[in-house]
Regions:
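Short alpha-helix plus adjacent loop in nuclease-associated cores
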Residues: 84-122, 129-133, 176, 277-286
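Gly/Thr-rich phosphate-binding beta-strand-loop-beta motif of the actin/hexokinase/Hsp70
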Residues: 5-28, 109
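Short glycine-rich, Thr/Ser-proximal phosphate-binding strand/loop in the N-terminal lobe
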Residues: 22-45
Length: 429
């Protein structure tokens, strides 16, 4: 269902608790409860019942997102019935409720729909659903491939057999696998290793077939092909990340503003503010974890290609303690990259560098994970750049294992600053 749901425009509100074989249905109207019943998990019996008992009345439906997918939604939408699919985490729950049944769940959905307390998730079109199936299959196969490689290495380690030496990036080349098949092993170990190698080669073929199918599918669809070109014009975005983004975002026309995608990916900070006091914490981590991980991986590539993003990365690093600086900064870059993704999709044009920013290449120290301050630095109270804290911020105690002994608020009072050392805004009420 597109647009906002307005309860006063409908007469009957139908809550559906959908399971594998049946549907628990509850009907309510503006006056209250009407009836509850069970029926088979098909759209036809539900439609026949509605036409028979509620003729000439405007009816709305809602059910929870889950493993049953969009089949019921498609059946209702085909007959022009509005249907919402609500995210389970966004459905109001009574804190004192101790009884849960299908009938009570469908009744709660119906009442919440009547009260206008539910919002539908984004429902992708058939094209984007097919692309999502392909990208999910690739993720599963790649995960299985990594597990198979780990099982082979674990077997060799357990048996005290050295893995054949190979250059970085070529550990699983044809030559290495050929050496593994020729290793001197006992009978059962040899059999197990051969079976694992056969499974490894089969998984590799499955991954290649899936990748080929994703490329073919995107190439044959004009809209997907165009959007892929726009996304791949961004630094740090390759065809794998681009296809994953399109599969999860769906129709780009549903994007309302350039910040919505960052919220969808869980790259915006949590916030607990009251009055004039603003307190922001870590990112929300909502949405697809795999897609967020891919975007962060792409951000590492982006800061090597784009001078503006590289300088932004460095500026964020300077605001945070040494042991977390690079991790916090790369997440900030990923959020900035998500805004660029939204822009190229909403404006349907490739990314163009506004002004080339001259920036020194990244060093190994900047990109590698930073360890905690050692004991000597803790005693001396050194900052990430090596200077002492007492000379820069009056009244500040020394660091102890990366944590300040005095509160951030006290530091801000001492320096009359509106920002803490962690880059968060702190305002006193």
């Amino acid at each position: 269902m597109r647009g906002n749901f307005i309860p006063r425009e409908y007469d009957i509100f139908t809550g559906l608790d959908v399971s594998k074989k049946s549907i628990s249905v509850t009907f309510t109207n503006h006056q209250g409860f009407i009836r509850s019943l069970n029926m088979p998990h098909k759209a036809e019996p539900l439609l026949n019942y509605v036409r028979k008992h509620f003729p000439d009345q405007k009816i709305a439906f809602v059910y929870e997102a889950g493993p049953t997918g969009y089949g019921l939604y498609d059946g209702l939408a085909a007959q022009a019935y509005p249907c919402l699919i609500a995210a389970p985490s966004m459905i109001p729950r009574a804190p004192g409720q101790r009884v849960k049944t299908n009938r009570l769940d469908s009744k709660a959905l119906s009442e919440n729909l009547r009260g206008g307390q539910l919002k539908s998730i984004h429902i992708p079109s058939a094209t984007y659903r097919q692309l999502r199936h392909l990208t999910q299959l690739r993720d599963v196969l790649v995960s299985e491939l990594a597990g198979m490689k780990q099982r082979i290495k674990s077997l060799l380690l357990f048996e005290g057999i050295e893995f054949p030496p190979a250059p970085a990036g070529s550990q699983w080349s044809f030559l290495v696998k050929d050496k593994l098949r020729k290793l001197a092993c006992s009978g059962t170990v040899r059999f197990k290793l051969d079976q694992l190698l056969d499974s490894l080669e089969f998984n590799e073929k499955q991954v290649l077939k899936t990748i080929t199918e994703i490329r073919r599918f995107c190439r044959n669809d004009p809209e997907l092909s165009q959007c892929m070109k726009y996304l791949m014009s961004l630094p740090g975005i390759g065809w794998i990340t681009a296809s994953q983004l399109l599969a999860r975002i769906g129709d780009w026309r549903e994007l309302k503003n350039i910040r919505q995608l960052a919220g969808f990916l869980g790259l915006v900070p949590t916030e607990h503010s009251t009055g004039e006091r603003v307190d922001r914490g870590s990112i929300t981590r909502t949405g697809d974890e795999r897609l967020r991980s891919k975007l962060i991986q792409g951000s590492w590539s982006a800061i090597r290609q784009d001078g503006e993003l590289r300088e932004f990365f460095r500026s964020v690093c300077r605001k945070h303690p040494r042991e977390v600086a690079s991790r916090v900064a790369i997440v900030a870059v990923a959020r900035k990259l998500s805004v660029r993704i939204s822009v190229v999709l909403m404006k349907q044009r490739p990314y163009e560098v506004r002004e080339k920013v001259h920036s020194a290449p990244l060093t190994q120290e900047e990109t590698s994970p930073r360890e905690r301050l050692d004991d000597e630095q803790n005693r001396e109270g050194k900052t990430p750049d090596g200077s002492t804290l007492e000379t820069e911020i009056p009244g500040l105690c020394a660091l102890k294992r990366g944590a300040f002994r005095v509160s951030v608020t006290a530091v801000c009072r001492a320096t009359n600053s509106s920002k803490s050392l962690f880059g968060r805004e702190v305002k006193e009420s």
